[in-house]
Structures are given as C-alpha cells and as structure tokens.
Design a protein with these regions (language model features):
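Eukaryote-biased detector of low-complexity, proline/serine/threonine-rich segments
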Residues: 382-424
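Short, solvent-exposed loop/linker segments at the N-terminal edge
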Residues: 341-348, 452-460
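Short solvent-exposed strand-capping/beta-turn motif centered on an Asx-Ser/Thr pair
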Residues: 356-362, 465-471
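Short, solvent-exposed loop/linker segments at beta-strand-coil boundaries, enriched for Pro/Gly
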Residues: 370-377
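Metal-dependent de-N-acetylase/amidase catalytic core
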Residues: 13-37, 118-122, 128-335, 407, ...
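Active-site rim/loop-helix segments in enzyme catalytic domains that contact anionic ligands
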Residues: 14-141, 163, 170-174
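Short beta-strand elements
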Residues: 413-452
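Bacterial N-terminal signal peptides
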Residues: 1-11
Length: 471
C-alpha cells in the first residue's frame, strides 16, 4: 500500500514581485535612514498599523512587527475556517497589511490557544525559555534600536497573551545584550523598550510629563496619501476579525511610555539620515535614481549589496528586500520556478531559471549560475535579452529543496549577486498566474501484520500511523 502525504518545502511565495518607482524609492529611503524599530505584540491585528506606516514611511525606519502567534485561536467573520486554517488566513492578512504600511513581518512558534487571563498559563503552554530564545535571536538578527510594545506588562493588557508579549520584550532586550546568552548569535544592545500607549488606557495621558508625544500628521508624496490613511488601509486587511475601518486623513497622535532602557525615543523619532556605510550608499543610490542617473543608481545599490553580504545572509529579509529593489533598478525579471506542484520526492527536483531584460536601454550580462548540481560560469558573460534566457536547474540539495540559486549579473563595472528562492509558478483559468510554496510528495510504504484481501465485497477498516523519518 502506498499513501501520499504532502510535506511543504521552501516557504517562499514569489520571487518576482515588481515594484513601482515610488515603492523602490521608499525602500531605498528606509535603507538610507539607518534606523530600525521592532514592534512586538501577541496576535495578527494587535499591531498599530498607523504607527508602523509612519515609522516606515515618514521616519524611513526599517520597521518589523513580531507577532508571537499566527492567530489560530480567534474567530472568523468571513468564513468557516477555525484553528490552524484560520491561522493561515490571519498570517496572509498580516502580510497583506505589511505590504500596505511598508513594514516587515516576523513570527515565533507560539500557539494562539484562545483567551487567557493568566500569564502563568501562557508561559506553561507556550514554553517560556524556547520562546525567549526565538525572540532574542530575532532581535539579534534585525538589530533594532528600539522595541515598541502594543501592551503594558501587567493586567491592564487585558489578555494573558498580551501581557506576556510585553514581558517578553523587556526580558529579551536585556538578554540580547548578554554575550553569555546563546553564544551561537552575536549580542545586540537595544536602546530601550517603550509601550505604545493611548488615552484608552489613560485618559490623562496628554498631561503626563513622562509620556512621549508623536504628531503623525503628514502627507507622503511617494505613496500619495497621509500616513494615517495608509495605516487605516493596512488595518482593513484584517478582514476575518472584522477590523475594517473607514479612512481618516485628519490629525493623528500617538503616545509612548518607557518600560526599560536609557534611550531617548523622543529624539529618535526626529527624521534624519544615517551616517554609516550602508546608509550613505543607499542615500547615494536614491539620489541617483531620483535625478534619473540609472547607471550611478545601479553602481551604488550593487555596492550596498556587497556590504550587506558581509553582515547578513542571502536569505535574510534585508538582503531579499535589497534584491527586489536591485531587479527594479536593473529592469530585469529573474525567477526560479517549478511548473508543477507538488513534486514527487527526489532524487531530482527540476526547475527553470528565467532571466529577461525589461529595460532595453541597459546592458545587463549573466556571468554565472550556481545551483547544488551546477556551477556554470560564462566567458564571456551573456547579455540578457528581451526574449529572455531559460536555464534548467536541479533544486535537489542533500535530500531537500535548496534555499536559493545564486546568479551573478554584471552591468559595466557593477557586480550583482542574486539569491533567487525557488517557487512553484502555476496558472489557472479563473485566477491567472499565481505562485505557491513548493511541496514534496513522498511515497509512504505500509506493511500489514496480517493478510489483507481486496475486492471481497465486504467493508473493512484499515488503521495506520505515520511517523517522520527522524522518528
């Protein structure tokens, strides 16, 4: 007997996601600010989308929302899906919100088990130490200057999950700077942890001398709307929880109170430019793109990519964001995909690498391709054409699907390294072209401890258990 089981592999959804010029400029501005903020709460829809929109687009900070859960314990206004299926919906809604407000999205493995009054119950079910380690590693990877929580670390949060998320933010800010904690990752010092409070919690907040006030009024010419309106549009992505809101373009204000640390959030929230190597390269690239100097924009953005590779991994959010902008500036379509999904289990996972020139005024060359079973250099380098070049590659990498295919492009003296994550690219008559994570479909062989007769005309039941390869 052979049973089929879907096991999801690489969880990347879509390598090629074209940017508009304004989106590319906004992303360059974030790289150029040198500022990084981590927003922490418990569930999808807990985050303050208006604040994330302001931080990402007015302050130009690299702003990430860390949601401890995926929201599988909530209700569903728009369908019958609950539990894990609801968690999938809420995760997609959360990512849709980030695509509107300009933030990035991260999760931990914490399970949303529904409402909880007790923080002790939360830590028992979540596993305090494991979640703490996940959060510290996220902080050390993203290197935020400040952490902002949606909730206070006490009973005012109104939900055990909420309280726990604020407690965790403070604990992990301290531990992230401790070189003796988790020596596998480098320590990082957060300047402070602040609570994004409101008059809902404290009606006298406006008169509190310890509260930091932020005027979020303002219009973003690149995005064509106010920061409040952008945040409201992002908020309305949380459809299954019924969080659609009307757009408000009027004045907006936010308040913050310090929970831990010595950093001055008030001074930090004043927009300015970073002076480190990454920020300066991003600023130069943005200026060149703004005045129409495409070649200089490519050169500076490519140089920034080399700097990033010295400090982060190719699959990191930051490098993948850099890569998306790089493809826009080059005017190149680049993608690695399979044309069927799921795929039968190894020993081969055939895929197609496509490279196509979209901007005919620029000469971009393919210099090399590196896959698990192919390391191909081209001498001389091959000019990308408008018809596109296709190359068959094998994604098989020691029993798994490889994380990425490395492609080296060249434009004049600029060297561009792309790390393309494989996806399944499919088409449907109702929805058109779409992408999904590649799934592997292994065969499971079953042995019975007694003889089994088929087609006897009698009904019977066969019971079985499925175990993973590692037991």
């Amino acid at each position: 007997l052979v049973l089929l089981l879907l096991v999801f592999g690489n969880q990347s959804f879509g390598q090629f996601s074209p940017l508009t010029q304004s989106q590319a400029m906004a992303e360059m501005e974030r790289f150029g600010s040198g500022k990084r903020v981590l927003y922490m709460a418990a569930h999808p829809d807990d985050e303050n989308t208006r604040l994330i929109a302001w931080l990402s687009n007015a302050l130009d900070a690299e702003t990430t929302y860390l949601s401890l859960t995926r929201g599988s314990g909530g209700q569903n206004l728009i369908g019958d899906e609950l539990g894990a299926e609801l968690g999938v919906i809420r995760e997609h809604e959360l990512r849709a919100a980030r695509s509107v407000d300009g933030g990035n999205q991260r999760f931990t493995d914490a399970l949303d088990f529904g409402y909880s009054k007790s923080v002790d119950e939360v830590w028992t079910k979540w596993g305090h130490d494991d979640l703490q380690l996940q959060a510290v590693r996220t902080i050390r990877e993203l290197k935020p200057d400040f952490i902002i929580t949606r909730f206070p670390p006490d009973e005012r949060a109104g939900h055990g999950h909420h309280t726990a998320s604020a407690e965790l933010a403070i604990e992990c800010a301290v531990l992230a700077a401790d070189e003796k904690y988790d020596t596998a990752t480098a320590a990082w010092s957060v300047q402070g942890v602040w609570w994004n409070t409101s008059v809902w919690w404290d009606p006298t907040l406006k008169d509190d001398p310890e509260a930091v006030y932020l005027d979020m009024s303002g219009f973003d010419p690149l995005l064509g709307d106010t920061y409040g309106a952008i945040g409201d549009a992002a908020r309305s992505m949380h459809k299954c929880q019924g969080f659609g809101v009307p757009i408000n373009r009027g004045p907006r204000e936010e308040y913050f109170k310090k929970l831990w640390g010595e950093g001055d959030l008030s001074a930090y929230l004043m927009p300015d430019r970073g002076a480190d190597a990454q920020s300066l390269l991003a600023q130069d690239a943005a200026f060149a793109l703004e005045i129409g100097d495409q070649k200089q924009a490519i050169a500076k953005w490519a140089e920034l990519g080399q700097v990033l590779l010295e400090q982060t991994t190719p699959e990191s959010d930051k490098y993948q964001r850099w890569q998306q902008v790089m493809l826009h500036v080059l005017g190149v379509y680049a993608e690695v995909f399979t044309s069927s999904n799921p795929m039968p289990e190894g020993p081969s996972y055939p895929a197609t690498l496509v490279l196509q020139a979209l901007n005919f005024d620029l000469e971009v060359k393919l210099a090399s391709v590196k896959a698990p079973t192919k390391d191909m250099g081209l001498n001389p380098a091959q000019v990308l054409t408008s018809e596109g070049q296709e190359l068959e590659v094998d994604l098989y990498d020691e029993g798994k699907i490889t994380k990425y295919i490395r492609v080296r492009l060249e434009h004049e003296s600029a060297i561009i390294l792309l790390y393309l994550k494989p996806v399944a690219k499919l088409s449907d008559r109702a929805v058109g072209e779409y992408r999904e994570a590649i799934a592997v479909e292994p065969a499971i062989h079953a042995k019975f401890d007694q003889t089994v007769y088929w087609n006897t005309g009698k009904k019977g039941t066969i019971g079985y258990s499925i175990y993973s390869k590692d037991g």
